[in-house]
């Protein structure tokens, strides 16, 4: 049975799917349970990207949030991006210091909120950003046997290390809604519709999931999140990686 959940005010509709032998942490299981309850009650969670790190007329201030300034509290869902973390720098692609990012993710969880993470990783073939679509072989190149596979595994290792560092003071791993390879029904990212086959895209997803499992990253819920291009269910699910690795489906 598919359960519709409105997760973000930005438009993400998600559906839980059966997910066997995941070995999720209790905290990740609890987050999924709470999302199901949101759906059952026909409620939604309001979210805001990079909420506590910059806003209208400010950047980098501590203990600040445009949403809190207007509504009196932080948003239920915050999203952040992991882009450029894979390169080993000290800031992500939104110019947020990595240590600040880690701290805000943990703080959001400890105040009772949820966190979603996307990953606009750089193009491993050209060295440019995720929006560089000048080469249509990038996905194939990072899959097993591809020319960029080893480099990309190193990048994913850095992301896995960051995920595993999201730990509270009492040792709990912060549960995260992870939505890599999003908006793939468009062609503005190197993993987009015109840049790889459906088989390659599914393989990219499965490789990502299996790598995180091998690295002991058990506190993630995985979200399949196409753009708004699909006109019907068949188009929407054309590149769906499978119920055994996907926890939620949505729109980006």
List the model feature ranges, each with a label.
Residues 178, 205, 218-235, 250:
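Cell-envelope/glycan interface and biosynthesis
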Residues 47-49, 79-81, 116-120, 179-181, ...:
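A cross-family glycoside hydrolase active-site/sugar-binding cleft signature
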Residues 78-80, 236-252:
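Aromatic- and acid-rich polysaccharide-binding/catalytic face
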Residues 18-77, 83, 88-95:
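N-terminal module-boundary/linker segments of secreted carbohydrate-active enzymes
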Residues 29-31, 58-67, 99-103, 158-162, ...:
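Alpha-helical scaffolding within the catalytic cores
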Residues 13-14:
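C-terminal motif of bacterial Sec signal peptides marking the signal peptidase cleavage site
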Residues 1-3:
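Bacterial N-terminal signal peptides that target proteins for export
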Residues 83, 87-218:
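Substrate-binding cleft of extracellular glycoside hydrolase catalytic domains
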